[in-house]
């Protein structure tokens, strides 16, 4: 039976992610902060919610910045929400925070005066929104283009390499909704809260061999 490690660094609704993974037949799902268990897992999921400063402080305190670099190289790895943002180089949040740097690019604030065609948009971006599949990827299998996923975020990703952006969203500005590089895949939305399409993405992750 394959094992899926959900990295626990004290920030994130980990059990809802774990339950969704179990629901799609992920095998043995372990919510853990044990580096040895994470290293031995067949697949790794890196969720996160909250302020990036607090997240990165805990990630560094636990040595998970180097661990994430290590385990994401050679097995399927999925970053979710702030777990995705932590994989970028830098975030504007909390007066500026350096992140893990696996994906080039910046995490930027939507702004207090975000508008679309003259209409004021609330920040955070919260609710259902379409994701355009800009590049084909195994994790999009059986998910229609422009399917709707559930988002909750005040900061968005401006990716440094367009070729790594496999999904885009729009909320006042265009932003990277999904990034991919080798065995790494990361999403701004919450697949565990996104009903049919979110569960399909998690099922695709469980079936994925990490090649792209």
From Swiss-Prot:
Localization, UniProt: Cytoplasm
UniProt xrefs under HAMAP family: HisH
Protein name per the record: Imidazole glycerol phosphate synthase subunit HisH
EC number per UniProt: 4.3.2.10, 3.5.1.2
Pathway: Amino-acid biosynthesis; L-histidine biosynthesis; L-histidine from 5-phospho-alpha-D-ribose 1-diphosphate: step 5/9
Gene assigned in the entry: hisH
Cited Gene3D superfamilies: 3.40.50.880
Protein role: IGPS catalyzes the conversion of PRFAR and glutamine to IGP, AICAR and glutamate. The HisH subunit catalyzes the hydrolysis of glutamine to glutamate and ammonia as part of the synthesis of IGP and AICAR. The resulting ammonia molecule is channeled to the active site of HisF.
Native source species: Pseudomonas putida (strain ATCC 47054 / DSM 6125 / CFBP 8728 / NCIMB 11950 / KT2440)
Domain Glutamine amidotransferase type-1 stretches: 3-212
């Amino acid at each position: 039976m394959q094992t899926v490690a959900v990295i626990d660094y004290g920030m994130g609704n980990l059990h809802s992610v774990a339950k969704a993974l179990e629901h799609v037949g992920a095998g043995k799902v372990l919510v853990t902060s044990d580096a040895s268990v994470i290293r031995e897992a067949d697949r790794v999921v890196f969720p996160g919610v909250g302020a990036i400063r607090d997240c990165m402080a805990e990630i560094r305190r636990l040595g998970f910045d180097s661990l994430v670099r290590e385990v994401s190289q050679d097995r399927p790895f999925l970053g979710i929400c702030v777990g995705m943002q932590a994989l970028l180089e830098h975030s504007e949040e909390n007066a500026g925070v350096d992140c893990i740097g696996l994906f080039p690019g910046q995490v930027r604030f939507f702004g207090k005066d975000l508008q679309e065609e003259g209409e004021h948009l609330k920040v955070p971006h919260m609710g259902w929104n379409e994701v355009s599949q800009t590049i084909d990827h195994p994790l999009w299998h059986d998910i229609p283009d422009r399917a709707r996923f559930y988002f909750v975020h005040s900061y968005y990703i401006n990716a440094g390499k367009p070729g790594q952006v496999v999904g885009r969203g729009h909320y006042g500005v265009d932003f990277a909704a999904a990034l991919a590089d080798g065995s790494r895949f990361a999403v701004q939305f919450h697949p565990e809260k996104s009903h049919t399409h979110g569960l399909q993405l998690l099922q695709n992750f469980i079936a994925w061999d990490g090649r792209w």
